[in-house]
């Protein structure tokens, strides 16, 4: 315990030293608001109503019943059907960033609360230091995997978590968990970190977690988009894509979740679009690095389950995203598992997570291409027998700017779903 306290004490010292240093002058969104349109017709609303007025729009989320879009206020006021749901964007942005008061509070609670890491959102350097600390704290359970480098030269890190060496049980099923594919979805990053910490911290003291790590392998990537995530801290809290160059010099970034090489489509949008898929499959460096890694290690990991964390809208999405005409294999069991995940969350926190086909969520049934090249479809079709995307809290009051006091509640409810998922993979008859 002394060794553990020493490690965490050093981590806190570094954390307090660097927190705030990575925060830059944020993009000003005082002239923008988020509008909710009660329409399920994406094509009519965006292509026929909004696009003729401006190309400065950003679709935050879409569902069967509504579409949330960030617009300049002067444009939003010209569209009668929209209801303002977020008007104070700069204030909400600041509320997601750590403060000096928070740092003082963390120093005070450290001795009695190792969960202090989850009191606030954390920048990329801090998260990477924390992953390295976990490897040192749990050397028999954790190995940091280096998947490759991003366009800006940052490492793409994963944690391999297992209670015993793969050669002792070569048939162990592997669960892959990813977060932060879209840079601004900070709650997805914190939620993945919460899950991996619970698995490690409870090993040996909880029968369930001990069984999970002894009988399953986990590959966990908390920040799938390191460049974009770092940029949300230093420049623009609402940045979505990665940061690589495109064929249009003034337009940086590819949407990683449109870059995977299953049912990929060449971009129909301008390179400046938030959903720009690039000019070739796997053009996004992060998607390419992951593809190369899982091919090189396919003899080491038998990937059986995949959970991709996103925000927002409180939904559990199942394949396929690219088309509503393509039926997934084993649909009945896939739906049963989806509703089981939703029930586990509801039992834990009372929150309702709707179960929806990813194609409906993406709007692929209305405008083909919106769900092309997704990580969900790629992993489901090529690697994982079971694959889901979880869109976390909330349902629109804060959108991507969920206050940090939600980190632990979201972590707890989502971890309940992960435990259900693990139980299912170990015993499909539950």
Curated annotation (Swiss-Prot):
Peptidase M14 domain boundaries: 120-425
Record carries keyword Amino-acid biosynthesis: no
Signal peptide: 1-24
PTM comment text: N-glycosylated.
InterPro entries xref list: Peptidase_M14
Bilayer-spanning residue ranges: none
Keyword entries, A-Z: Cell wall biogenesis/degradation, Disulfide bond, Glycoprotein, Metal-binding, Secreted, Signal, Vacuole, Zinc
Family: Belongs to the peptidase M14 family.
Protein name: Inactive metallocarboxypeptidase ECM14
Species of provenance: Saccharomyces cerevisiae (strain ATCC 204508 / S288c)
Classification lineage: Eukaryota, Fungi, Dikarya, Ascomycota, Saccharomycotina
